Swiss-Prot record:
Keywords: Cell cycle, Cell division, Cell inner membrane, Cell membrane, Cell shape, Cell wall biogenesis/degradation, Magnesium, Membrane, Metal-binding, Peptidoglycan synthesis, Transferase, Transmembrane, Transmembrane helix. Its EC number is 2.7.8.13. It catalyses: UDP-N-acetyl-alpha-D-muramoyl-L-alanyl-gamma-D-glutamyl-meso-2,6-diaminopimeloyl-D-alanyl-D-alanine + di-trans,octa-cis-undecaprenyl phosphate = di-trans,octa-cis-undecaprenyl diphospho-N-acetyl-alpha-D-muramoyl-L-alanyl-D-glutamyl-meso-2,6-diaminopimeloyl-D-alanyl-D-alanine + UMP. The chain crosses the membrane at residues 26-46, 75-95, 98-118, 135-155, 160-180, 183-203, 222-242, 259-279, 283-303, 311-331, 357-377. Its cofactor is Mg(2+). One of its GO terms (cellular component) is plasma membrane. GO terms for molecular function: metal ion binding; phospho-N-acetylmuramoyl-pentapeptide-transferase activity; UDP-N-acetylmuramoyl-L-alanyl-D-glutamyl-meso-2,6-diaminopimelyl-D-alanyl-D-alanine:undecaprenyl-phosphate transferase activity. This is Phospho-N-acetylmuramoyl-pentapeptide-transferase. One of its GO terms (biological process) is cell wall organization. It holds the Pfam family Glycos_transf_4. It comes from Anaeromyxobacter sp. (strain Fw109-5). Pathway: Cell wall biogenesis; peptidoglycan biosynthesis.
């Protein structure tokens, strides 16, 4: 917004010329998002406490220490979304469809998460929105954004009959980490859309599963946002006419550098939220936060052509999800459990690990995996 309103005035006010640089707007978005989260955090937490919008997602088989967390203010993800949205709208180029796609999927998933949280709070149980209904809504959000923003509808006429042809604004080729795009980058064609939906929905639900300990989900989310900031910038930026993507032999995505503003906004909001969510947490993000952030990260993976690399970057989220899948499969087929409890962070809790130790070690793993993902830029 500031880019559109103030940059045209740079001729009269030279200071506004800095808005032409994505690098400046990326830093500014992160700082503003951080300040919004830090300043509004206490007010939000107190309001949730007064309204008794507390954590009620406590299962009967949950570790004993978690039962003490019942009543802690929840739905802190709404504050994250506010900070991310305001910062992105202020500093991003609003003519960039990629930015809108990432933001709208994030907000759409936030609405789904809010509905889920509201049902849990109003009915005082851990069930919330039915799993199948939630999944259908997640798919519909991605479809709406894809056909509404990422599709080029081209009117044509054949034999006097008008019709529309569809051109995707998203590259339908699959890119692999550590493999130069000119050597191997197969086109998925029409299969790319279901693949895209899978990446976004799976990432969203994986973050949701990880959000079980104080600060556990937001830590890797912060790491991922900074990693995607770097990945998006090199995918779209040109310096003195020189394409970083061409030099690194990765897919060139025009306008992808603007996604750095969105990534920075997530980073700033995430740091601010962690200030209040760190052990012992004063607020939980709820599904409104975990589903939204996961959806946003999934879209970033798609829009920057790092769908496969995101499996490395999001290794912590992936491990949590796989642990649940294996646990359910093992119990249904053999009647035995592989882990003491799933997701796997609860397994370590029941082994006697202190909650902060589990959280920090998962953060360390997330940082290590992010470094591997970044290494894939050069090792091709």
């Amino acid at each position: 917004m500031l880019y559109h309103f103030l940059y045209p005035l740079s001729g009269q006010f030279g200071l506004f010329n800095v808005l032409r640089y994505p690098s400046f707007r990326i830093v500014a978005a992160g700082l503003v998002s951080l300040l919004i989260g830090l300043l509004l955090g206490p007010l939000f937490i107190e309001r949730m406490r007064v309204l008794q919008y507390g954590h009620s997602n406590v299962r009967e088989d949950t570790p004993e220490r978690h039962k003490k967390k019942a009543g802690t203010p929840s739905m802190g993800g709404a504050l994250i979304l506010l900070a991310v949205t305001v910062s992105t709208l202020l500093f991003a180029d609003l003519g960039n469809r990629l930015v809108w796609a990432a933001l709208l999927v994030t907000l759409g998933y936030g609405v789904i998460g809010f509905w889920d949280d509201w049902l849990k709070i109003s009915k005082r149980n851990s069930k919330g929105l039915a799993g199948k209904k939630k999944l259908v809504l997640q798919v519909l959000v991605v479809l709406a954004v894809y056909y509404g923003l990422l599709t080029d509808w081209q009117p044509r006429t054949t034999d006097g009959f008008p019709f529309l042809t569809i051109g995707s604004l998203v590259d339908l080729h699959l890119t692999l980490p550590f493999v130069p795009t000119h050597l191997f980058s197969p086109s998925l064609g029409w299969l790319y859309l279901p693949f895209m939906i899978f990446v976004v929905v799976a990432t969203s639900n994986a973050v949701n599963l990880t959000d079980g300990l104080d600060g556990l989900a937001i830590g890797p989310t912060i790491v991922s946002s900074m990693t995607f900031l770097a990945l998006s910038y090199v995918a779209g930026a040109t310096i003195a006419g020189f394409s970083l993507a061409e030099y690194l032999r990765i897919a060139y995505i025009p306008g992808a550098e603007e996604l750095g503003v969105f990534c920075s906004a997530i980073f700033g909001a995430g740091i601010a939220f962690l200030w209040y969510n760190t052990y012992p947490a004063s607020v939980f993000m709820g599904d409104v936060g975990s589903l939204a952030l996961g959806g946003g990260l999934g879209m970033l993976a798609v829009l920057t052509k790092n769908e496969v690399a995101s499996a490395i970057l999001h290794g912590v989220f992936l491990a949590e999800t796989v642990s649940v899948i294996l646990q359910v499969w093992s119990f249904r087929t053999t009647g035995k459990r592989i882990f003491r409890m799933a997701p796997i962070h609860h397994h370590y809790e029941l082994k006697g690990w202190a909650e902060p130790k589990i959280i920090v070690r998962f953060w360390i793993m997330s940082i290590m995996l992010a470094l591997v993902a970044l290494m894939s830029l050069k090792l091709r």
